UniProtKB/Swiss-Prot annotation:
InterPro entries assigned to the protein according to its UniProt record, in alphabetical order: Aminotrans_II_pyridoxalP_BS, Aminotransferase_I/II_large, HisP_aminotrans, PyrdxlP-dep_Trfase, PyrdxlP-dep_Trfase_major, PyrdxlP-dep_Trfase_small
Listed name of the protein: Histidinol-phosphate aminotransferase
Domain of life from the UniProt record: Bacteria
This enzyme's EC code(s): 2.6.1.9
Assembly notes: Homodimer.
Location of N6-(pyridoxal phosphate)lysine modifications: 212
The organism of origin for this protein: Geobacter sulfurreducens (strain ATCC 51573 / DSM 12127 / PCA)
Gene Ontology BP terms: L-histidine biosynthetic process
Length: 350
């Protein structure tokens, strides 16, 4: 028998959303991808980086992603020393646990939210403590002083879609003895963000991804904003060439084309509000969403029945077996045409 670490042998592992091999034949609304292509500047930047014969691919990329960090800094008003680039924001989440939570030490997060936090903690051998939600969408039983090494707060929350108010997030920062990680994967679709809290609190880290709002899920790009001491610690443990040349070129081009970005996010927000209103007329319970998706429950609260009906029509949404979520589905927001087809299917399914 091979000598796996006991925690690795015991863990189940994270189960990502299904990626059908014949994806073009589906209406794919299950993993919160952007329905629109990335900025045209992205393709130009990739081709320019390839340079015709791709000769640059034989050399390593920038280890520090300096141009990227400067681009993010200019966009959000931070010195590059406050920014670290990552192979998707998941890499930052992983390295935060590696940096702060040793074996047997505690990390916390809200359930339901991103269950990958627990997987990352299990890999490290850290203990996991989950907190539920109250009826008014606050954290149930959060102590006056939370002593865990890290607390992960997904806002806007996935899969539910609501966002925590900024004042409440700041209150949590003052109650965390360790680090408050504000996971803002969906913040670009929301009415506000928590970036300014990094300036006011040394224990706040904000993570972002380009997978959703910038249409770059296939390139794995993310970043974190934190105090320079935190960034320096994360820099010690990341893969030294964590972003390839093409990803770096694509990211810079995408971030610099804010006109295209704003147009795509506006369309998604508008479609989200239209679709939410339409399915409410069918009797669906829909949580007001600040993300690029909605969590919706049919009148009979049988989410699996509706999921199966959509699946049979080659419309793929996300259904969770968790008892807290099984009554509904998370439906990513696609193009207006995709959502009209989904609405028509929901009417047929009943």
């Amino acid at each position: 028998m091979l000598p796996f670490r006991s925690n690795i042998a015991a863990m189940a592992g994270y189960v990502p959303g299904y990626q059908p091999p014949d994806v073009a034949s589906w209406i794919k609304l299950n993993t919160n991808e952007n329905p629109y292509p990335p900025s045209p500047e992205v393709v130009k930047a990739i081709l320019a980086e390839l340079g015709g014969d791709g000769a640059l691919l034989r050399t390593y990329p920038s280890a520090s992603s300096q141009v990227l960090r400067e681009t993010v800094g200019e966009l959000f008003g931070f010195d590059p020393a406050w920014i670290i680039m990552a192979n998707g924001s998941d890499e930052v989440l992983n390295n935060l646990i590696r940096a702060f939570a040793g074996e047997g030490e505690e990390i916390g997060y809200v359930h339901p939210s991103y269950s990958y936090y627990a997987t990352l903690a299990e890999i490290q051998g850290a203990r996991v403590r989950t907190f539920g939600l109250t009826d008014d969408l606050r954290i149930a039983g959060f102590p006056g002083r939370y002593e865990g090494k890290l607390f992960f707060l997904t806002t806007p929350n996935s899969p539910l879609g609501f966002a925590f108010p900024l004042a409440y997030i700041e209150e949590l920062a003052t109650r965390c003895a360790g680090v408050l990680v504000v996971d803002e994967a969906y913040a670009d679709f929301a009415d506000g963000d928590a970036l300014d809290l990094v300036r006011r609190h040394e224990n706040v880290v904000v993570t972002r991804t380009l997978s959703k709002s910038y249409s770059l899920a296939g390139m794995r790009l993310g970043f974190a904003v934190a105090r320079p001491a935190v960034i320096a610690a994360l820099d010690k443990i990341r893969d030294h060439y964590n972003l390839d040349r093409l990803a770096q070129a694509a990211c810079v081009a995408s971030l610099r084309d804010q006109t295209y970005f704003a147009g795509c996010t506006r369309l998604i927000r508008e479609t989200r509000e239209w679709f939410s209103a339409e399915i409410r007329t069918l009797g669906y319970e829909v949580i007001p969403s600040q993300g690029n998706f909605v969590f919706a429950a049919p009148p009979d609260r049988d989410g699996k029945r509706v999921y199966d009906g959509l699946y049979s029509r080659k419309i793929l949404v996300r259904h969770f077996s968790d008892p807290l979520l099984a009554h509904g589905m998370r439906i990513s927001i696609g193009t207006r045409e995709e959502m009209e087809a989904t609405l028509a299917a929901l009417k047929e399914i009943g």
